[in-house]
């Protein structure tokens, strides 16, 4: 009996092993995990070698956690949660942390490099000394020869054969010659293609002078413009003797006078340094930033509130109209009213931009014929804001209308029948029955719509580009700019350079403001529901 049981269990075990397909085997799983680990390690090493330490660390953490979750049976339950958590961390938390970190630095178009990299760029600069020779590049078997010509007396120098395959700096001796090369010289295209190799070529004259490529047709005597001081930080100008020190407050190498005071002269490129709360203080105290920031913040709030109000009002009224039982052809009206929602928003915005054209737009042509007026839609702040609200209402009402059409189906007909028996009219039914029953379920969606319009970058960028521009501001700002558009213009359109640190500080303030407004809206909606 026991033998039969053992034989049966052995048979069942064999059959279960046979049922496991090859793509479900542990060997294949570990092979895939091993290959993924090797590929990830390769990517991390590349990121680290290129100086992208932060991205390398984030990639290492996410992939390591992912491999542990999907390879360990104890973490089986986390397999369903980890992709969402990793995505939120990578696309929400990581950019947020980076933005906040940049807000405390002077990171900009003039201060993008690290200190070591900026110092290296400055040390690589050369200045021209001595004579300038024209050159020609001539083939010699499988190598090349460099022929230098002195433009003053026509004397010739020819180099020993060299190859472009050498790495690093390559020194070649040149000797005087009375015979010019008779072979065909290399074309400008070949010289351009080999410019990097020629730039690392050093031609040494018989007197020991060193010549380097200074243009596509010339070799000149050059020397490093700056040399490094004994402390490893000071830079000394070889032409003027001026000494420069790294200024940790500005992120530039600046000249220092005899008293040890900083002078205005500074060297570019600069380097990134931590400046604490200076960017935030600029927003709060610099009048050139404070005035447009406050004005833009107020307009952003008004735009968001009015956009939600208008879209809900128009959408709710149209939903009630197309749901009216006595209306004939309701299906046609529904399709026509929903069409704006089917057209991509950026196409509609550009169409409206043409319609509102002040000189040739159809809207101004019609207003001119009917009323004799031509509003300045793009040059007057009030009319520009009115135009934006009109276009945004057109873009947003179909969504609210669809929601209201669905919610109207949930209202019992008994309520309207009872109100009809009491002698109530359509307006009383709307304000006493329909509106109160629709507004509560719409509240969360209205909050979401408010948050969306608060950061409605595309509408402003395509329709007005923030214009008309404000006068007397230290940063680019317009009357129709939202906070997100203002941040974009500070970061990428500044006349004095792209100030990413200031833009990150404004973006951080926007994040705090939107979060605070969302909390207030949620609390208010909770009180209404209670």
Swiss-Prot record:
GO molecular function terms attached to this record: ABC-type maltose transporter activity
Top-rank taxon: Bacteria
Keywords (A to Z) from UniProt: Cell inner membrane, Cell membrane, Membrane, Sugar transport, Transmembrane, Transmembrane helix, Transport
Topological region Cytoplasmic: 1-26, 71-82, 319-330, 409-428, 523-530
Membrane-side (Periplasmic) residue stretches: 50-52, 106-295, 353-385, 452-499
Membrane topology annotation: Multi-pass membrane protein
Subcellular location: Cell inner membrane
GO process terms (BP): maltodextrin transmembrane transport
UniProt entry tagged with the keyword RNA-binding: no
Domain ABC transmembrane type-1: from-to ranges: 297-521
CC terms in the record's Gene Ontology section: maltose transport complex
Transmembrane segments: 27-49, 53-70, 83-105, 296-318, 331-352, 386-408, 429-451, 500-522
Known partners and oligomeric status: The complex is composed of two ATP-binding proteins (MalK), two transmembrane proteins (MalG and MalF) and a solute-binding protein (MalE).
Similarity remark: Belongs to the binding-protein-dependent transport system permease family. MalFG subfamily.
Function statement: Part of the ABC transporter complex MalEFGK involved in maltose/maltodextrin import. Probably responsible for the translocation of the substrate across the membrane.
Name recorded for this polypeptide: Maltose/maltodextrin transport system permease protein MalF
Species of origin: Yersinia pestis
Gene: malF
């Amino acid at each position: 009996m026991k033998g039969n049981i053992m034989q049966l269990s052995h048979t069942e075990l064999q059959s279960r092993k046979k049922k496991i397909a090859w793509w479900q085997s542990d060997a294949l799983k570990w092979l895939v995990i091993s290959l993924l680990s090797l590929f990830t390690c390769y990517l991390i090493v590349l990121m680290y070698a290129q100086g992208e330490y932060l991205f390398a660390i984030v990639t290492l953490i996410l992939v390591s956690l992912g491999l542990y979750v999907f390879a360990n049976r104890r973490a089986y339950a986390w397999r369903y949660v980890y992709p969402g958590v990793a995505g939120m961390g990578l696309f929400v938390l990581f950019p947020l942390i980076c933005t906040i970190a940049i807000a405390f630095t002077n990171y900009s178009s003039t201060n993008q490099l690290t200190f070591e990299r900026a110092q290296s760029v400055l040390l690589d600069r050369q200045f021209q000394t001595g004579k300038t020779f024209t050159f020609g590049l001539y083939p010699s078997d499988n190598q090349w020869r460099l022929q230098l010509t002195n433009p003053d007396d026509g004397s010739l120098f020819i180099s020993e054969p060299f190859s472009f395959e050498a790495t690093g700096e390559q020194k070649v001796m040149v000797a005087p010659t009375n015979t010019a090369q008779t072979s065909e010289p290399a074309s400008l295209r070949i010289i351009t293609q080999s410019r990097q190799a020629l730039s690392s070529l050093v031609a040494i004259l018989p007197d020991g002078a060193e010549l380097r490529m200074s243009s596509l047709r010339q070799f000149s005597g050059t020397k490093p413009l700056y040399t490094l001081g004994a402390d490893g930080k000071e830079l000394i100008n070889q032409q003027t003797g001026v000494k420069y020190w790294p200024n940790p407050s500005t992120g530039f190498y600046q000249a220092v006078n005899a008293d040890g005071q900083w002078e205005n002269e500074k060297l570019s490129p600069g380097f990134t340094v931590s400046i604490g709360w200076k960017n935030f203080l600029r927003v709060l105290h610099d009048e050139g930033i404070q005035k447009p920031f406050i004005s833009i913040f107020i307009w952003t709030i008004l735009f968001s509130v009015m956009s939600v109000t208008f879209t809900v009002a128009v959408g709710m009224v149209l939903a009630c109209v197309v749901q009216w039982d006595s209306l004939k052809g309701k299906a046609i009206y529904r399709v026509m009213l929903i069409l704006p929602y089917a057209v991509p928003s950026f196409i509609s915005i550009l169409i409206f931009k043409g319609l509102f054209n002040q000189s040739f737009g159809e809207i101004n042509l019609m207003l001119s014929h009917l009323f004799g007026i031509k509003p300045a839609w793009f040059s007057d702040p009030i009319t520009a804001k009115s135009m934006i609200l009109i276009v945004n209402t057109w873009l947003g009402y179909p969504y609210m209308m669809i929601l209201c059409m669905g919610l109207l189906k949930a209202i019992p007909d008994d309520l309207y029948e009872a109100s009809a028996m009491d002698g109530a009219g359509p307006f009383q039914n709307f304000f006493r029955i329909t509106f109160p029953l629709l507004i509560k379920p719409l509240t969360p969606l209205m909050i979401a719509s408010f948050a969306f319009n608060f950061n409605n970058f595309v509408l402003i960028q395509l329709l007005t580009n923030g214009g008309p521009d404000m006068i007397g501001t230290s940063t680019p700002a317009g009357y129709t700019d939202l906070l997100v558009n203002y941040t974009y213009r500070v970061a990428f359109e500044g006349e004095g350079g792209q100030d990413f640190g200031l833009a990150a500080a404004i973006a951080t303030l926007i994040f705090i403001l939107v979060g605070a407004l969302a909390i207030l809206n949620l609390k208010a909606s909770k009180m209404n529901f209670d």
